[in-house]
Amino acid sequence: MKLSIALALGATASTGVLAAVVPQQEPLITPQDPPTHHHQEKFLIELAPYQTRWVTEEEKWDLKLDGVNFIDITEERNTGFYPTLHAGSYVHYPPTMKHAEKVVPLLRGLSKDNMEQNLNKFTSFHTRYYRSSTGIESAKWLYSRVSDVIEQSGAAEYGATVEQFAHSWGQFSIIARIPGQTNKTVVLGAHQDSINLFLPSILAAPGADDDGSGTVTILEALRGLLQSDAIVRGNASNTIEFHWYSAEEGGMLGSQAIFSQYKRDKRDIKAMLQQDMTGYTQGALDAGRQEAIGIMVDYVDEGLTQFLKDVTTEYCGIGYIETRCGYACSDHTSASKYGYPAAMATESEMENSNKRIHTTDDSIRYLSFDHMLEHARLTLGFAYELAFAQF
């Protein structure tokens, strides 16, 4: 995830809360073919809705160094699918928390030690850059950890699965699916890749906060959720999925591939929550702010975001603060583009977030596992309440 600067070419990024998506609409201007006089591979990126540009991979990283968010829509152009954002929400979420007596005991089982152990290992890979061999190795390790959690819970006996979602660039995404009584699905997401923007293929990118913190946060929430016998046995009303996306740093490539496939398969996704950067609090404290969970209020679903605030109030020991990150700041953008209600939580207000990301210094030593535990509580409460929601 990146702190977005004010984009002169993206005035629509400040238009307030946006939500669901109308698919299959033609863009205002159909993207033109890339210039042919350069030999470098070109990628079509979108910096705001329908504001596109052809760039090289190096130019992608230059934009990110400048704090500019984008989504890589090269493949979308090839399919002829042009979704568009619009205001409003088509899913109604519970106005109150209805399962506190079940959720609170599960929250007590969440472990900071588990998250620290997992993050220590996850950051030991030289880089998790999605085109690197160590990015594939880190994905294999994460897949084995997710598989262990599913297996140890007994959920596999009732149909729970873990899938490697393959991509052309090597590093796969991971999907853990816990079936419920219907195919209506709630998704919890984080991105597993990391990047060093100075030399992505060479320099170390431990990515402790971005987004190792979100990765182990939702992993621990999955483990905690599977302490529920009702969830394990598939007695929840809805199916729950946990996603670990590849190639977010390349422009939400992994999550786009998944949600575009879900759209083709006519999957009924009722909610998607992204956790990107959940561990850094010192910036907020240095600014004289109280520790709080940052909840995005731009380019998200308004109804789902209100529900997320309610979950935070009910199940977390700290409050929330509204913040904005602009267009295409993390994988919830992909869900929204393909018509699914999405929300996002992060560690603080964006202006106080971790400035060491995308460097060799994005290290565990700067993170608060107490804060990450609050995000795990949020994730578990969100998942359980919506698992039993009547949509």
From Swiss-Prot:
Its EC number is 3.4.11.-. InterPro entries: M28_fam (IPR045175), Peptidase_M28 (IPR007484). This is Leucine aminopeptidase 1. It holds the Pfam family Peptidase_M28. Its cofactor is Zn(2+). GO terms for biological process: proteolysis. Zn(2+) 2 binds at residues 210, 249, 358. The keyword Disulfide bond applies. Keywords: Aminopeptidase, Disulfide bond, Glycoprotein, Hydrolase, Metal-binding, Protease, Secreted, Signal, Zinc, Zymogen. Monomer. One of its GO terms (cellular component) is extracellular region. Binds 2 Zn(2+) ions per subunit. One of its GO terms (molecular function) is metal ion binding. Belongs to the peptidase M28 family. M28E subfamily. It comes from Aspergillus niger (strain ATCC MYA-4892 / CBS 513.88 / FGSC A1513). Disulfide bonds join 325-329. It comes from the Eukaryota. Residues 1-19 form the signal peptide. Extracellular aminopeptidase that allows assimilation of proteinaceous substrates. Glycans are attached at residues 183, 235. Residues 20-91 form a propeptide. Its main location: secreted. The gene is lap1. It is found in: Secreted. Zn(2+) 1 binds at residues 191, 210, 276.
